[in-house]
């Protein structure tokens, strides 16, 4: 890949760099594959994170990461660590294809806007996150409902969707959607912005270690920055559920909050459980975020190298 005139020769091939011309179809295919691979590897970690996020202060079922893993596997079977994997896998495939497809299109379309490369990546990444999260949110809600189920009985995706439709209506599939989309937009923007900042600095100053650290750094910082929003929206996704007794030992506590909006639920959590409740599951989330981001970006770049062995020249910054 050629560097633009007057800029340092790039040490690494980066399909996410400002102005990089990537086929929309190839971006969609690579994004789908990267999303599916990342989901398959990290699904059990996601289950543990969500269980921790949904546990009320009055409950003492799960104590720490390893205890949660063991408890879920012992009481519900090892397969339970992959509960919700069907909608989650579909979501990751669709999300990955939309995210990287939108990013590839905007990356060239907005290259002439005159933004610095780092700001360009952040803005394009945020818009890509907005589009992908908006169109995949119902799958995210279904995944949360299926993962939250603590019983050994597995609910089918079709049954859960039917229950939501019958008891909550079409709007039930978008419960907490606005804040979730805002959080995902911010997360995606931070991931791409931080990733490109690190890789540009690595190429400019000849720091291979910084290039290697780009993906995990982007994942950790982005996840930590928006985690409280993620925790509140997980609670919001189940608060109106018909099967709430399957999700908690204290269904009355959730039932009392039916109809509560995002900010009201956040305030209630802080008052009833302390500000630390907003960060329940953060350790697991950070442990999951690093491999998820690394796998997603690495597989995406790798797929494009296979799909596009000859690269188009980089547009001027």
Swiss-Prot record:
PROSITE patterns recorded: SOLCAR
Annotated GO MF terms: thiamine pyrophosphate transmembrane transporter activity; thiamine transmembrane transporter activity
GO cellular component: mitochondrial inner membrane
TM ranges: 21-41, 86-106, 122-142, 176-196, 207-227, 281-300
Keywords, comma-separated and alphabetical: Membrane, Mitochondrion, Mitochondrion inner membrane, Repeat, Transmembrane, Transmembrane helix, Transport
Position of the signal peptide: none
Subcellular localization(s) per the UniProt record: Mitochondrion inner membrane
Topology in membrane: Multi-pass membrane protein
One biological process term in Gene Ontology: mitochondrial thiamine pyrophosphate transmembrane transport
UniProt keyword annotation of Transport present: yes
Solcar repeat residue intervals: 22-109, 116-201, 206-306
Chief site of localization: mitochondrion
Family per record: Belongs to the mitochondrial carrier (TC 2.A.29) family.
Functional note: Mitochondrial transporter that mediates uptake of thiamine pyrophosphate (ThPP) into mitochondria.
UniProt protein name: Mitochondrial thiamine pyrophosphate carrier 1
Species, as recorded: Eremothecium gossypii (strain ATCC 10895 / CBS 109.51 / FGSC 9923 / NRRL Y-1056)
Name of the gene encoding the protein in the UniProt record: TPC1
């Amino acid at each position: 890949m050629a560097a633009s005139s007057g800029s340092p020769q790039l040490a690494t091939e980066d399909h996410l760099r400002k102005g990089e011309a990537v086929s929309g179809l190839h971006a969609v295919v690579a994004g789908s594959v990267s999303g599916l691979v990342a989901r398959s590897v990290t699904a059990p970690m996601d289950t543990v994170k969500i269980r921790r996020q949904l546990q009320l202060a009055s409950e003492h079922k799960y104590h720490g990461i390893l205890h949660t893993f063991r408890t879920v596997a012992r009481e519900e079977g090892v397969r339970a660590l992959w509960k919700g994997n069907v909608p989650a896998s579909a979501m990751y495939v669709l999300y990955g294809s939309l995210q990287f497809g939108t990013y590839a299109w905007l990356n060239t379309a907005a290259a002439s806007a005159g933004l610095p490369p780092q700001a360009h990546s952040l803005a394009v990444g945020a818009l890509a996150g907005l589009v992908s999260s908006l169109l995949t949110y119902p799958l995210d809600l279904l995944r949360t409902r299926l993962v939250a189920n603590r019983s050994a009985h597995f609910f089918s995706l079709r049954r859960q969707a039917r229950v939501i439709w019958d008891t909550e209506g079409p709007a039930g599939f978008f419960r907490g959607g606005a804040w979730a989309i805002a959080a995902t937009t911010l997360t995606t923007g931070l991931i791409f912005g931080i990733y490109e900042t690190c890789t540009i600095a690595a190429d400019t100053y000849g720091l291979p270690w910084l290039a290697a650290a780009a993906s995990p750094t982007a994942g950790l910082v982005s996840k930590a920055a928006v985690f409280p929003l993620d925790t509140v929206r997980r609670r919001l996704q189940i608060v109106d559920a018909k099967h709430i007794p399957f999700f908690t030992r204290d269904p009355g506590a959730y039932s009392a909050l039916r109809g509560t909006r995002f900010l009201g639920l956040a305030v209630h959590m802080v008052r009833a459980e302390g500000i630390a409740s907003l960060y329940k599951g953060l350790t697991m989330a950070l442990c999951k975020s690093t491999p998820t981001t690394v796998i997603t970006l690495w597989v995406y770049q790798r797929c494009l190298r296979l799909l596009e062995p000859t690269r188009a020249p980089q547009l001027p910054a």
